[in-house]
Each structure stands twice: as C-alpha cells, then as structure tokens.
Amino acid sequence: KNFKPYLIINLAAQPGVRFSYIRPDIYLRYNLNGFLNLLEVMSELKLTKLIYASSSSVYGDAITFPTNEKSELRPLNLYGETKVINEKIAEIYQKYYNIHSFGLRFFTAYGSLGRPDMMIAKSIKKIKKKEIINLYNNGKHTRDFTHVLDIIEIIFILSKKINSFKGHELFNICSNNKIKLNYLIKSLEKLLKLKSITKN
C-alpha cells in the first residue's frame, strides 16, 4: 500500500484462439477474473490510470475496411469475447470508480521472441523442416502485422498522454498494411534462402 504508481500497464492474459476451445476455464479465470481483480485493487488503492491490452479479435471477421475503433464488434471465439467484456468492465470502472484507461486493440503482434503458435513462427519452422504450409484461399487472406518494438513505442507515448486524460478510450494498434499470407511466405523464403512447400 505504500507503493503508489501513477500508471498501471496490464498486458497479462491467456492468449490464443484454439486453446480457448480446449480450456475455456483458463480464459475466464485469467482474462476476466484477473482483469477484474486488478481493477478492484486499483479502486481500493485509489490508482486512477490504466493502459491495458485488448485485441483485434474483438472484430472477428471484420466487414468494414479499413477497420476503425467504431467498427462492429463480432468476436468469433471465447478469447475475443473476453476482450470485449474487459473493455466493458474498464468502461464501468471509469464511470463509477474514476479509473481512466486506454484499451489497445493489438493486431497480430510479432517479434523475435514471438509465440511459437503464431503464423510467422510456425511458417519459419515449417520452411526449415520442409513441411507443408496450408494456405487457404490461395494465400489471399490478409492480416495486419504489428512489430513488438512499435507496440512498445506506442505504449510509451500513451503513458505520457494518459496523465492528463480522463475517460476510457480504445485504440487500434496496427501497421495499417494488409499483408497477403502468400506474400508473407515469399518474404520468409527470401530471408531464409529456402523454398516453402505450400498447399492450397
């Protein structure tokens, strides 16, 4: 109780979509209860500034492009649902408990220490092992990839702005570039100097 930070940055959560079908209890415990517990502690200690991680998963299969913060929320899985609920919880705690926050909807974060179940890491591994990479729709699906260093820089900038901010605001954190997955695979081939084996 003697430690009174001016800002809490919460990036903790159980990530991933597929695992949410296997262990939904973990997503409810960490993503919902964990977030609620954090806000309760902040309320008790009179801490009023929060930056927290949300996700582009709140949009599901977006029907508007480019997707902006006012786009319809259509989560397709429990992971996305927990992020939508977190945003609602943050809004309630701002209104009734004076906790002002920025929610950051990250779009496919990547980096050198990225999760092994993510597209880039999985593709690199399969190219090296000469395993088949399944590409649907001839690899024409697109994603927006955001490097972790860009994410850190954005969080740093927002950490300076939140000091004088009152309210609850959501931000899409992305590169604003739609990358086709077949283009991604070709780029990885060039970097690795190896050919991939793809299947449509």
What are these regions (language model features)?
Residues 127-200:
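C-terminal substrate-binding subdomain of Rossmann-fold SDR/epimerase-dehydratase oxidoreductases
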Residues 6, 18, 25, 36, ...:
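Residues in well-ordered alpha-helical elements
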Residues 22, 30-33, 70, 77, ...:
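Residue-level signal for the nucleotide or nucleotide-sugar donor/cofactor binding architecture
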Residues 1-109, 190:
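N-terminal Rossmann-like NAD(P)+-binding domain of SDR-like oxidoreductases, especially those catalyzing
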Residues 65, 116-126, 188:
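A glycine/serine/threonine-rich, flexible loop-to-helix segment
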Residues 38, 93, 122-127, 154-158:
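A short, amphipathic alpha-helix embedded in the catalytic core of nucleotide-handling enzymes
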Residues 19-20, 61-63, 113, 145, ...:
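Short glycine-/acidic-enriched loop or helix-start segments at secondary-structure transitions
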